[in-house]
Design a protein with these regions (language model features):
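Core catalytic lobe of class I
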Residues: 1-201
Length: 201
């Protein structure tokens, strides 16, 4: 079965995962920034945290902007390099894994359940920015169209950069994609004042 044919099941399973997820227990006694701003720094499962915000902190429909930078479906295990002060040696410790036993469908279910939670958190004038790259952004766009509605797609922003090498098998992959969605047509947008100069590629 093709991945496109699995999209309805992925959406259904993600909705069930969101509904069955219990709010995490987070210590809110530590805040970041000015004490009266209500900023929270949290460590834990982000789906459980969003359910905590929705059900415990009563933040449903109160968030104006969400920026999310999920794993890119690279099929790689990532490590962090830490320098040990005593020996001046570098050691590698596991950071996170972007490998998925069930492939694309498992990854899409994981992200889809979280996108559903994000929509619940967004205010009527709220926006969502999803940072991705070439690996799987085309499938995420389909899921976002289903969750937020095709008419609430505002922009695709292409972020180009110069780092990375070249290949003998394909053009260099030197850009990321940001998908910009609104919850409704009431979203806030500040027009760009500075013109973009045309440059030759």
């Amino acid at each position: 079965m093709s991945l496109i044919a699995k999209i309805p099941d992925i959406l259904k399973q993600a909705q069930e995962e969101y509904e069955n997820c219990r709010p995490g227990v987070f210590d809110t006694s530590y805040q970041y920034g000015e004490s009266d701003t209500g900023n929270i720094v949290a460590e834990g499962d982000n789906l459980e945290f969003m359910k905590f915000l929705i059900e415990t902190m009563d933040m449903r429909g109160k968030v104006n902007l969400i920026y999310v930078d999920p794993p890119f479906f690279t099929k790689i295990k990532y490590e962090a390099v830490v320098k040990m002060p005593a020996t001046n040696e570098n050691i590698s410790i596991p950071a996170y894994t972007d490998k998925w036993e069930e492939g694309e469908a498992e990854y899409l279910r994981m992200l889809c359940s979280r996108l559903i939670a994000m929509k619940e958190l967004l205010a009527e004038d709220g926006c969502l920015w999803v940072h991705l790259d070439w690996h799987i952004s085309h499938y995420i766009k389909i899921l976002l169209d289903e969750i937020f509605g095709y008419n609430n797609f505002v922009n695709e922003i292409v972020w180009t950069y110069k780092s990375g090498g070249s290949s003998k098998r394909h053009f260099s992959r030197k850009h990321d994609t940001l998908l910009f969605y609104s919850k409704t047509k009431k979203y806030y947008f500040k027009p760009q004042k500075r013109k973009i100069l045309q440059q030759r590629l």
